[in-house]
Amino acid sequence: KHKNENINREMVVQNTLTFDITKQLTLNADYSFKWRLKEISNRSVKVPYSSKEGTTDYIDNFRSVDSYHQQLARYQTHNYNVYLRWAPTWDRHSLTLTAGYNGEMYRYHSLEAERLDLMTEDLSSFNFAKGEVTELSESIKTYATNGFFARVNYNWAERYLFELSVRADASSRFAPGYRWAVTPGGSCGWRMSEEPFWEEI
C-alpha cells in the first residue's frame, strides 16, 4: 500500500494597459501575478513476509517503514512595469524620451513533515500517526527588486543616431548600503546608406 502523490496547481494573471495621452505621449503599464502550489505526499508501509505458515514477519530495511511524509510549498511572484514614452518629430528630427519603473516581488513558503507508525494502512494522515516525528521543517524565501530607467534617442533623417540611457536598480538580496547600482550608457551611429552620395555608388 505504498503511495506517492504529486499535485501541482498553478495560476497566472496578466494585465496590460496602453493609454495614448496625446498623439506623441503614451503611458504603458503591465502587471503579472503567478501563483503555484505544490503538494507532495508519500505513504510507506511495512512489507510483510512469511517464512512458515501461521507466522508473519516484516522486512527490516529502510524501504519497509510505516510512515507518512508530506511537503506543502507555495510560490508567489508579482511583476510590475510602468513607463512613459514621448516621441515628437519635426522636420527631419526624431526624438524619443522614455522613463519608467519595473519591479518584482517573490515569496516561497514550504512546510515539510514526517511521522512514523500510523494506526491503519488505509488512511494517510498525521492525525492517525502515533510514532516518532522524524522530520519537521519550514523554509521561507523572499526577495524584491526595483528598477528605474530613462532613455533618450535622437536621430536626424534616419542618418545620425544618438542614445543616452541610465538605470538605477536595487535588490533585497544584497546587504543594506549595497543594494542600489546606477548604470549609465550611451551610443551613437551613422547610417552611411542614408547619405546622398551612397545613391551614386
Regions found by a protein language model. Give the residues of each.
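Feature captures outer-membrane beta-barrel proteins of Gram-negative bacteria and organelles
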Residues: A181-W190
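Flexible, active-site-adjacent loop/turn segments at secondary-structure boundaries
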Residues: P88, E121-F126, R159, S172, ...
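Outer-membrane beta-barrel transmembrane strands
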Residues: H2-N42, Y68-T89, T96, Y108-S110, ...
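N-terminal glycine-rich FAD/FM-binding segment characteristic of electron-transfer flavoproteins
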Residues: G100-N102
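Surface-exposed loop/turn segments flanking beta-strands in extracellular/periplasmic regions
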Residues: K1, N42-D66, R107-L136
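Secondary-structure transition/capping motifs at alpha-helix termini
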Residues: T89-R92, W156-E158, G189-I201
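Outer-membrane beta-barrel proteins
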Residues: L37-N42, K46-V47, K52-E53, H93, ...
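Extracytoplasmic loops and strand-loop junctions of Gram-negative outer membrane beta-barrel proteins
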Residues: K1-H2, D60-H69, R85, A129-S137, ...
